[in-house]
Amino acid sequence: PNNKNIVLSAEQARDLAEKPVFVIPTSNVAEGIAAAVAFMPEASAEENVEAMTASIENVKCGQVTTAVRNTRMDGFSVHEGDVIGLFGKKIVARGKSPSEVVKHALKKMIDEESSVVSLYFGSDVTEDDANKLAAEIQELYPDVEVMAFNGGQPYYYYVFSVE
């Protein structure tokens, strides 16, 4: 479903279906893409469910958006209009520019086992800006492959994953 709030509904629909239905419990687009990449056309449904579900366990997902109100959370004092970086349910970075916030958030997400960073840039980000950010991240983390994709999402400057 790519939304943690929809997983339960999808599972209930599966239970009511008269034909076999499988739910991969993805909670965001980055997990959904990782699961889709793990799909093997030659494998059985059960094997695919296992592989796709396992793939989402290796994905860390972050988002960069604009704060809609003043708040204090996770040790950050955030003001309406600040650009914030989220990792899981926590604010992990705050700043004035989306690219600055992505780089700060990635510091909390990338470790020695990380090999790929995927940036999905939103409708308020130009392809040139996204490619520039990807190049900066590549320079910071030369052992990690960095890719930028047009996600077109309206509310997040960036959705990004680390695998």
Question: Where are the language model's segments positioned?
Answer:
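N-terminal loops that bind phosphate or other acidic moieties
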Residues: 1-163
